[in-house]
Structures are given as C-alpha cells and as structure tokens.
Amino acid sequence: MQEWLEILLIHTLIDSSSLSPQRLRVMNRIISSQGSDLIKQKLSQHTSFFGIKLWILITASASIAFLLVLIISVLLCFIFHRRRCSQEPFRLRSKLCLPLSHIPLTNKQQIPYNRCGDDIESQRISQVGWSSARLSYYTRSFSSTGSFGSFNVFTFMEIKNVTDSFADDNVITKGDSSTVYRGILMGTVTVAVKRFLPSNSRYEDKDFITKAEMIANVRHKNVVRLLGYCIEGDERVLVYEYAEKGDLHEWLHGSAGRNRPLTWRKRMKIIQGVAKGLAYIHEDIEPKITHQDIRPSKILLDYQWNPKILDVGFIGHSDIPTLIPSPGNMDEKIDVYSFGNMIMELVSGRVSVDQSSPHVRVYLVDWIKEMVANHMIVDVLDPSLPEFPTIKELKRIVLISLRCVDPELKERPKMGDVIHMLQPHDLLLNNNAIQKAQKITRSHEVSAISIRQ
C-alpha cells in the first residue's frame, strides 16, 4: 500500500510537462501494474463468510441475483398472460376463420372466447344480445382438451368463408335434411360443417342453442366433438371436428372399400369403439342420450381408424335435430339393435337392406339368421376381406350381433354388457347364450316356413 502511495505522490509532484513521453508511458504502466496486483490481492483474500474467497462470493451473489430476476420476470409474464386470457374478449376471428382462399373476413364480431383451455369448475353462459330475427351473440365457455379451448359461435359470413361459400368441391356428404362440407379454420385446421336445409329451421333460436350446448359437453374418444354452431335467420349450422378417413359407409359400400377393403382387425376395432361410445352416452352422462340412428354413415373414422359417432343427441330422420333424453331403456334398446345390425354389415360387407332385385327387399338381419340356422355361418363373411378370422372368432362376433337384434327388447343386452362380451373370454358368452342364439334362429326359420306356406 505504501508503494502505491509513493507512486501517486511522485506523479502529482513532478510536472508531467517536464517528463518525456517515454518516461510517462513507463510511469503509467507501473501504476496500472500496481493497481492490478492490489485488486487481485483483495479478491483473493478470505472473507468472514465461511472463509470463502471474495471473488467467489461476488460471483455467486451476482448469479443468484440474476436467477431471481429471471424467475420473477417469468412469473409476472405468466400471471399477466393468464389474466389476459380470462378477461379479454376474443378479437382474432379473422385469423380463426380464414377461408380456403385466405380472403379476409368482413363484418367481424367480437365474441367472448376462452383461448387458454383452462379448467373452469363453474361453467358460465355469456349472453350479449338478442334480436327478433336471430341471436346476435351467445356463447358458453367450458373446459376443452381440443384445439380451440371453448365452444364457438360463428357468424354465417364466417361459415361461408370457411367453406368457400359452400363450394361443391367441399361437399363431404348429402342427406335428406342437411349437407356436410369440409372447412378450414385458422388456415390449417380442417372441420366438418353441417348445414341444415331451410325447411329444417323453424325452431326458435333458444331451443337450437340449448340442444347444441348440451351436446357440446359430450366428450368421448369415440364421439365426434361439436366445436360450435351458427344461427342466423333460417340458417342452422353445426361445426364438428373432422375425421380424416371419412365415414364407415364409404369403406364398406363405397369406392374406398372396393379399393382398400378394411381388414378384420380394423373392423373389430371399429365395433369395439362404437360400443364404447354408445355405452358412454347411454350410461355415463346425465341426462342420458340415445342416438336412434346408428348406421355406417354416422360413424366417422380418424387417421388411426378410431370410430367416432356423429350426430349424438340428434335424431337423424327428424325435421331438425332434437335432443332426446332417455326416460327409460326403450330408446337404448333401439340403439342396441342398430349396433347389432352394424356389426352384421361389418362382418358381411352387405348393406342393411338389399334392394338390388326388383320388388324384393332382403334384410341383412333375416339373411344372417337364416345362414346361421342352416349352419352356413362361414358364408356370411365379406369375400373382400384381406384375411379371414378363425371360426371361433367369427361365431363369437355373429353371436353378439344376434343378441343385439333379439326381437324381445328385454333380451337385448346393455351396451356396457356388450363391451364385456366383446372381450375374448367373457363369461356372458357361455353355452346358455349360444343356446339362446340358436333358439332365435330356429324361431325365425319356423316363421319363415309358415310365411311360405
């Protein structure tokens, strides 16, 4: 320390103008060297804090301070984002509903929308405005595991842009009461847009909305999810999640099935998935819902061949979709019968009612029963199958289908029981069940003979 003071004293007393530049550079170098050595000496000294060196203590303190600032910043950003998600209205409808040609939307409406997908224990209904002609805004936010995070209300202009003004190229299927179109949301997300014919739009807005919102709460892997709706004037539109493989009817009786027939394993996967979906809506939710129109065209298939039941809670043959709570088990038994008939279509590859011959209708259920009664069960198999099941497996599946189409309602199993029956070693498929199926086929044979006489 004394050497350092002496150098400073010399430096201040001597007139720098009398020194040559070379001597000044030497003196500055000496001063810098002395100062550097002093700093190193101080930093290398042990402190009273557990004897840690000063430079280590300073470095550790700076690192801890930096981490604390970083953590606090991240927490503040997260809290701000959560508050913003739960409070701000959704103002990105133009980005959500991009048309296929990416034309910007006009006359956009701001609709409350939960983009975060957070769990909401108490569901809330946000009703912003009503008019005599139509419902202006109405949305219900709830927890979602899908891409959008809540139930959506679309304007008809948005629906038109999503489907390119309902272009014929986007038609997926046409029915007696509606047409289903392919649409694009957010420029990349494909959806199915179901537009009902104007003749099916005479019901009040509140009724349609209540039914749609109840169906939106149905969440199951084997049920097509309802993403939102549109209601303006006479227009009634439902927006569903999209299934990449199309409907089962196309794979059984259309061009897709002729080019690439479904394997036995895929058919069994479809049967099991539909059974689980029906058991869910029959037994696991309140109010219970029945479908009443189970058929291959109502079963959609995703890219992994998982079946998804379409139009859950809506009667397919009515003028407008109507929610049907099941007061008893009669409606459920109708679904069980339709499910058994669908199994027969999957096993045989035949349509439910064959009208290829003029003035003759051949019902698949009757044909299967006749083949079983005549011990020709092998002949019921779809000849286009890439590989055939074992006789034991075939008998098991046909037996299940026969139990489902039992003429006696009380003898038809519940869908929950059917799921157990589909397991390879289920106790429900015992000798008594086999005798019951044989009794059904024999009674059918007797009735058929009496009709001929």
Swiss-Prot record:
The modification Phosphotyrosine is found at residue 240. Pfam families: PK_Tyr_Ser-Thr (PF07714). Keywords: ATP-binding, Cell membrane, Kinase, Membrane, Nucleotide-binding, Phosphoprotein, Serine/threonine-protein kinase, Transferase, Transmembrane, Transmembrane helix. This is Putative receptor-like protein kinase At2g30940. The modification Phosphothreonine is found at residues 155, 322. Residues 166-428 form the Protein kinase domain. The keyword ATP-binding applies. It catalyses: L-seryl-[protein] + ATP = O-phospho-L-seryl-[protein] + ADP + H(+); L-threonyl-[protein] + ATP = O-phospho-L-threonyl-[protein] + ADP + H(+). It is found in: Cell membrane. Its EC number is 2.7.11.1. It is a single-pass membrane protein. Disulfide bonds: none annotated. It is an enzyme of class 2 (transferase). InterPro entries: Kinase-like_dom_sf (IPR011009), Prot_kinase_dom (IPR000719), RLK_Ser/Thr-Kinase (IPR052232), Ser-Thr/Tyr_kinase_cat_dom (IPR001245). Belongs to the protein kinase superfamily. The chain crosses the membrane at residues 60-80. GO terms for molecular function: ATP binding; protein serine kinase activity; protein serine/threonine kinase activity. The modification Phosphoserine is found at residue 297. GO terms for cellular component: plasma membrane. It comes from Arabidopsis thaliana (Mouse-ear cress).
